[in-house]
UniProtKB/Swiss-Prot annotation:
Entry protein name: Methylenetetrahydrofolate--tRNA-(uracil-5-)-methyltransferase TrmFO
Record-listed FAD binding positions: G9, G10, G11, L12, A13, G14
Source organism of the structure: Methylorubrum populi (strain ATCC BAA-705 / NCIMB 13946 / BJ001) (Methylobacterium populi)
Main localization category: cytoplasm
Functional note: Catalyzes the folate-dependent formation of 5-methyl-uridine at position 54 (M-5-U54) in all tRNAs.
Amino acid sequence: MTNPIHIVGGGLAGSEAAWQIAQGGRRAVLHEMRPRRGTEAHQGEGLAELVCSNSFRSDDANGNAVGLLHQEMRSLNSLIMRAADANQVPAGGALAVDREGFSQAVTAALEEHPNVTILREEVAGLPPETWGSTILATGPLTSPALAEAVGALTGRDALAFFDAIAPIVHRDSIDMGKAWFQSRYDKAGPGGTGADYLNCPMDREQYEAFVAALIAGEKTTFKEWEATTPYFDGCLPIEVMAERGPETLRHGPMKPVGLTNPHNPTVKAYAIVQLRQDNALGTLFNMVGFQTKLRHAEQVRIFRTIPGLENAEFARLGGLHRNTYLDSPRLLDATLRLRARPQLRFAGQITGCEGYVESAAVGLMAGRYALAEAEGTTLAPLPPTTALGALIGHITGGHLEASEDAGANAPRSFQPMNVNFGLFPPLERMPRNETGKRLRGPEKAALKKRALTDRAREDLAAWIGGEDLPHAAE
């Protein structure tokens, strides 16, 4: 009997890796410590539990890098994308999911797969060498014992930062005499209608008082080691954004553009708080961009000053959780193996990707790399022109820059990253209009994104088919 491939961690990356291995005909053993041992952020014991937002972000495969990543993962039989599509809830142009239904779908698919064994146990340190090929997908909440073991093996400390969790509100406690349903610019998306967000308007006086309250509100106190731990810019607590300047929020999560208040259509709101459906029943809505480290009592007091939320009942209040990630360009090779111990691969947020979809995507590739290795074959390198290739390239070497002082392979500061078009190689030729004239402004940006996504689809199809890739060397 062939040796199984072990996966440690049953989050999005680990679940996707196990699925890819099992679908490839190899046995996968998935180790998940919950419910035997919980974490600071998880609520239940299901696999692929979403601990922060319920949004997979934009599903636009022509104009958005994460939407392109969705499409690429679907083309590679992603379990995470299959479960997301089956459990989508309205969210404008985004793909958002019923978090419980999503986790249940992933859990059921893996529990029922004949090639998957799920062991509910903690792997406290490094896996034994007798396991052979192993994928560590322990996520941002990697246990201290395992984090210390990895640090001891690599000789480098893992880096850490915080993610903050947004509150969830009961729909029936929102005052619809002040709030209204509308997606920004009335944009419909997967499962959406163009009226998928609840909007709560503020005038200037209300907004300024709200910002002042956020800044003055009592915050969660840090342990000594946490005091110097930075935040990831893509998930800043709302009060930290407020501290960056009085206009920051109304140009960020509270921007009022593309929305019209039907209760007072002639008056433009100064700022708008949006809430997004959080479950299939539509009974729960999360506050978009309102991740916070305010104390719970302060959250209730301050958030009830938002028009429409004066009597809000909270199903969950916001909080903080620690996120640990590797200095991956130094520590991992091109197939996500640990250079110091090639039996071990890493996947998910611990590698320095950021976001649900990105974590699952890295898990997908880690699973395929491990499967190919177990079968005695080698996967052709992913085209860097694809979303998958750009993301893996960023993690395993895209952040390297030559330096006379530090050597040719010295990485500059490595930070967690969402997939974005800045990670893609530039186009050989910029888009032009029908007359051949070079474009400028929004039209140029839209056509450039379409050209990048068209190129990615062409190159991924060639990679899947084993064809020569004309753009891979750009």
